Each structure stands twice: as structure tokens, then as C-alpha cells.
Amino acid sequence: MKAIVFIIYTLGISTLFVQCKSVSSLSSKEEVNTVLNAWHKAAAEANFDAYFNIMTPNSHFIGTDATENWGYEDFKAYAKPHFDKGSAWAFTTLERTIFIAPKKELAWFDEHLDTQMGICRGSGVLKKVNGQWKIAHYVLSIAVPNEHVRSLTTLKKEWDEAHIKNLTKN
């Protein structure tokens, strides 16, 4: 009888640990989701300080233009005039997938966004800094349906060639 009670007790404790583990993982995803929503909201409301406080001081932002590859301070300088107008940019999340590293210090995600440019895709990395999730890296891309790629590449061919030449000159 004692053996049966011990087995039931052990199974109960094991189940509790498994449930706690999945709840804490879900909780980290919810935290990251909340941070990303707050970041997009800060941009829509032109809240410059809130927006940049969600990023690490050594973060990196890559925009839709091939020349938009900014460190934190350069991105702040680029963004400031947009925020000063009263609304920087308004991105509404359509869907988001979040991944949490086992030690819960890093997270990465991808998202589809409804933007003034149409559907865009965002992706990035967050890390825990003093117990808070901060965006360390973000990439914004315009989503182009495959059937429009040929006309798009034709449209930007000259610009791309000039930019490639500029990037490869030594």
C-alpha cells in the first residue's frame, strides 16, 4: 500500500513540475508579446522615450530600404523627426510567433504587420537586461507576393546596381 501511495505521490509531483515548466515558458512568451505590443504602440503614439527605452543601448535596427542599417544612436537620430510630427509609424500585428531560449535570457520572433506600406514582416531578438525584455535586433521587410517579384526587381534594378557597386568598391 505504501508503494502505491509513493508512486501516486511521485506522479503527482512530476506532473506539477511539468505543468509549472510549461506555464513559465508561456509566461515568458506573454512577456515578450507585451513588450513588442508596447513598442509598436509607442511608435503609433509618437512616444520617443518609451519606444527607445524598450531597445538595448547597443541594439540594431534594419529597415526596408537597403541603406537602413542602424545602430541605436543612428536609429534614434533618424526616428526623432518622425516622432516629433506626432505619429511615427503605426504597425498593427496580424500574427506573431515567439521562441524562448531554454535559459529564458533570449527570445526571437517573427511577425506579420499591417502598416502604411501594406503587409510587412518583422523579426528580431530580445534579451533580458536587469530582468526586463529589451529588443536587441529588429528587421523590417516589405512582404512582396511572389507573382510581383519580377516587376519589383525590374523597378529597382538600376538602384540596386548602383548600390551594389557602392558596397563592393574597395
Enumerate the language-model features and the residues they cover.
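Short, well-ordered alpha-helical segments enriched in acidic and aromatic residues
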Residues: 45-58, 62
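A short gly/proline-enriched turn/hairpin at secondary-structure junctions
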Residues: 59-70, 82-88
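A mature extracytoplasmic/lumenal domain signature
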Residues: 55, 65, 95, 111-115, ...
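Low-complexity, intrinsically disordered terminal/linker segments enriched in charged
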Residues: 129, 137-170
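Bacterial Sec-dependent N-terminal signal peptides
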Residues: 1-26
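Short, aromatic-enriched amphipathic alpha-helices that serve as compact interaction elements
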Residues: 28-47, 160-163
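A short, structured loop/turn motif at beta-sheet edges
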Residues: 99-105, 126-134
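Surface-exposed, charged secondary-structure patches
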Residues: 74-119, 168-170
